[in-house]
From Swiss-Prot:
Keywords: Cell membrane, Glycoprotein, Ion transport, Membrane, Potassium, Potassium transport, Transmembrane, Transmembrane helix, Transport. It is found in: Cell membrane. Residues 173-192 are annotated as: Disordered. It comes from the Eukaryota. Glycans are attached at residues 116, 164, 215, 401, 771. This is Potassium transport protein 1. Belongs to the TrkH potassium transport family.
């Protein structure tokens, strides 16, 4: 009851308020809850509610400004700051969006997901039953030896007969005894000799063939629509032998056993269980390709792949190989354009006899580069050796309604279809069965309903991948940060004295400081932050790494994390398809994951900003009191640490108030633009970028950039808040600012505090009388202004309502993409679909 009420409430709230409003509600609600807990949680000293609200706001927005000394708080109050920070960081928030979208995807396809789980359980059960010894597999199927033979070739012994006998009828039992109209059921009580004697040719009726020196291909045919006959090619051998299973390679015997062991009653599940190593096509017939190591059902039905070591030099090989997946020799061009696909029932091809090709060598090199190729193939064989295949000659009679499960497993199901005006159709893996029309920023347009469903399937799997990867990333980096800090706290020289001097437990200091670094909070239990430890190179550098990985550098680190996992970990092919789609079109699935080019741009921009801060620090602060006592090498490390903290965390390893005024100005500028690199990338890669800006470009504006539009919009939002906040605070703190004896207050220090709050950084010139931020001496109204600036600054750069990565699955999203495409290109989407349909025909 309660769950249904919550679901109805979310269904009403999300479309009504939009993502940004919900984000505000979430942050403000947690701020109020945290402030109440902080206000009531003090045991030794009580703090004012305005200070509790100020600390709670700094924690939930990751600002890091403190109006009271954190070391004076109780452990419970410190833990509240720690916990509420963890559930409001950008990684948590954007990851939660992915989980919510995944939940709605599952609700939309709940029946299909239930079927998917059932089939997955059946596959696991079947796999456990198939764990037999190697000797048992060598015996064939149910103790029988399997013969590989060509049907109805006993009359084609001479070349003359071969020319005269170009076709045979597959439905006439008198002319074609090897394709009976009513084959017996495998479950029928028929003896082996009786079955093979009735339906299979005798050994004397077979055609001998020298496999060492000839090619034989049966695909130059023009089948009759009325009779469904077969046409044999003109270049064939004059002799052929029947091969017993004992004469074949052991792996071929197992594969042949699998092909010959057919259970039509279980065939409905076959299309799902062979999704990793099989290709399924409904509209085209089954086609077989034979090699010395494979018995392959070709592209338009099933394909079973073999280990590379099993292919001898100069022997038979599969015709095509893409990324370790063996394709069949049957191409779409082999079918006549005027022929309906359903009129052909079988095709047998012998390809690659003693014919080394450039493609073969290239494929061999590609397979050797893959460390887990052989292992993955063996696992695929072990999963699929005894899986059933229908006796039926095509799958046209088994057509079912399109379901999500078939969408998820049909990446190779259909032949590639052309696209119109595609800006980008290159795919890391062929996760779609058609060549999509991909417009700006991964906008898929001019697609049919079936193509949209298939795109939704791969997007659903990519979304599952995002959820698992972002969870792993968050957990791994938090654990790694804690381990490094705990090692420092218990092993570093001098660390014990510093931590113990403030009556802190080293384990709790390590946990709090590591989370504060990775979550970019900037709070430190040591009142002077990192100043007492500014000579420890390890702590400063490792903290800088976690600070970058948790905030501004997260898109770069996260894409590298996904790409490395995609390359090294031996996933199933279905999961690799999802990861490939995620890397190709990241902004359809996750707000903080950018395409490769945009990620590199972000990386170099961040590097440039850090280098600028580093150079200014080293040049302008050479003789300042803050760094004069530090050796040159330690000074460089402190410069790196401070340049990183300027735009994110707000930690300090030197006294900020003692730095050169020009350095303080540069820090203020860096705090102001801290969110710009990520925000501009996020909006520039938005699928609905033009819709969010209200500006639509045409084909003539192809080379123009939207950077100017983004900057103009961002500045128009930001500057008003900053100057309005500064104006109100100057009114409230006018007496302190005008007092010449009060050195802590000036127009510049107040502006520095305002920009730090709006940029959610947390740097402050501080107070000479206490270890707090300048805000500690503000009046209540000024503190409320700082809180408002923190909340507004936390939400700048977030995606608007029109962002594909935050929208729930809906047909309206597809209409938005196509409307934008139509406005930009100036033609009807219906005409675009029509051109695609014509090209398919």
């Amino acid at each position: 009851m309660v769950l249904n009420y919550i679901q109805r409430w979310f269904k009403w709230v999300i479309p009504t308020f939009g993502f940004l409003a919900i984000h505000y509600i979430y942050i403000i609600s947690l701020t109020i809850i945290a402030s109440i807990l902080l206000f009531t949680g003090g045991t030794t000293t009580k703090i004012k509610y305005i200070d509790a609200l100020f600390l709670a706001s700094s924690a939930t927005t990751q600002t890091g400004l403190n109006s009271v000394d954190l070391n004076s708080l109780s452990i419970w109050q410190q833990f509240i700051l720690y916990g509420f920070t963890a559930i409001t960081v950008p990684i948590w928030m954007h990851g939660s969006i992915s989980f919510i979208r995944l939940y709605w995807f599952r609700r939309k396809f709940k029946d299909v997901v239930r079927q998917n789980r059932t089939r997955k359980f059946q596959r696991k059960l079947r796999k456990s039953l198939m764990k037999k010894s190697e000797d048992d597999e060598e015996q064939g199927v149910r103790g029988r030896k399997i013969r590989v033979m060509l049907p109805y070739l006993h009359s084609l012994r001479s070349p003359t007969s071969l020319k005269n006998f170009s076709r045979f009828d597959t439905h006439d039992s008198t002319n074609n005894p090897y394709f009976p109209d009513n084959p017996p059921s495998p479950k029928a009580d028929i003896s082996k000799d009786e079955y093979f004697g009735k339906y299979l040719p005798k050994k004397s009726d077979t055609l001998d063939m020298d496999l060492e020196s000839h090619n034989m291909t049966f695909h130059d045919y023009e089948p009759s629509i009325e009779n469904k006959n077969y046409d044999f090619g003109s270049s064939h051998s004059a002799s052929m032998q029947m091969y017993e299973m004992d004469d074949l390679h052991p792996r071929l015997r197992r594969q042949s056993s699998f092909i010959s062991s057919v259970n039509p009653l279980e065939a409905d599940d076959t299309r799902e269980t062979l999704s990793e190593g099989a290709l399924v096509q409904e509209s085209l017939p089954m086609a077989y390709s034979y090699s010395d190591t494979n018995l392959v059902v070709s592209r338009d039905s099933f394909t079973l792949t073999g280990d590379d070591n099993l292919f001898p030099e100069g022997g038979l090989r599969p015709a095509n190989t893409i990324d370790g997946i063996v394709r069949s020799s049957l191409s779409s061009s082999s079918l006549s354009k005027d022929t309906e696909p359903s009129t052909v029932d079988m095709h047998i091809a012998f390809t690659g006899l003693n014919k080394p090709t450039i493609e073969r060598e290239r494929n061999l090199k590609l397979r050797k580069k893959s460390r887990f190729y052989k292992k993955s193939l063996r696992s695929r064989f072990s999963r699929g050796l005894h899986r059933p295949i229908r006796w039926t000659k095509s799958f046209t009679s088994n057509r079912r309604n399109l379901t999500l499960e078939r969408v998820l497993s049909s990446a190779f199901a259909k032949k590639r279809e052309p696209s119109i005006s595609s800006r980008h159709t290159t795919m890391s893996l062929p996760y779609l069965s058609y060549n999509p029309t991909v417009d700006r920023n991964s906008a898929f347009v001019a697609l049919s309903k079936e193509q949209r469903d298939e795109l939704g399937g791969i997007e659903y799997r990519a979304l599952k991948c995002v959820c698992s990867m972002v969870t792993l990333y968050f957990i791994i980096f938090n654990i790694a940060a804690f381990v490094t800090f705990i090692v420092f706290a218990y092993t570093a020289v001098g660390s014990r004295e510093v931590i113990d001097s403030y009556d802190l437990r080293r384990g709790w200091w390590a946990l709090f400081s590591s989370a504060s670094s990775f979550n970019d909070l900037g709070f430190s239990l040591i009142p002077s932050s990192f100043v007492p430890m500014n000579r420890n190179i390890f702590l400063l550098l490792i903290s800088s790494l976690f600070i970058i990985a948790g905030n501004t550098g997260f898109p770069c680190f996260f894409r590298t994390f996904i790409w490395t996992t995609y390359k090294l970990y031996p996933f199933s092919f279905e999961k690799k398809e999802a990861m490939a789609f995620l890397l190709d079109h990241p902004r359809r699935c996750f707000t903080l994951l950018f395409p490769s080019g945009a990620t590199w741009v972000l990386f170099f921009v961040l590097l440039l900003l850090n280098v600028i801060d580093l150079v200014l620090f080293m040049v302008l602060d050479t003789g300042s009191k803050a760094v004069a006592s530090l050796p040159k090498g330690i000074r460089v490390v402190n410069a790196i640490f401070q340049s990183v903290c300027t735009r994110t965390a707000g930690f300090t390893s030197v006294s900020i108030s003692e730095l050169h005024p020009a350095v303080l100005v540069s820090y203020m500028v860096m705090m102001y633009i801290s969110v710009y690199p990520v925000a501009i990338n996020m909006r520039n890669t938005n699928v609905y970028e033009e819709r969010s800006l209200g500006v639509y470009r045409t084909e003539d504006d192809e080379g123009k950039s939207f950077l100017k539009d983004h900057l103009t919009e961002q500045l128009s939002y930001d500057l008003w808040y900053i100057f309005l906040g500064l104006f109100i605070i100057c009114i409230c703190e006018g007496g302190k600012i005008s007092n010449p004896l009060d050195t802590d207050f000036s127009i510049f220090t107040v502006l520095f505090e305002v920009v730090s709050a709006y940029g959610t950084v947390g740097l402050s010139t501080g107070l000479s009388s206490s270890n707090c931020s300048l805000s500690a001496r503000f009046t209540t109204i000024s503190k409320l202004v700082i809180i408002a600036l923190e909340l507004r600054g936390r939400h700048r750069g977030l995606p608007r309502a029109v962002d594909r990565a935050i929208l729930l699955p809906s047909e309206k999203n597809n209409l938005k993409e196509e409307e934008d495409y139509q406005r930009r290109h100036g033609f009807s989407i219906d005409n675009a679909r029509g051109s695609i349909a014509v090209s398919r025909d």
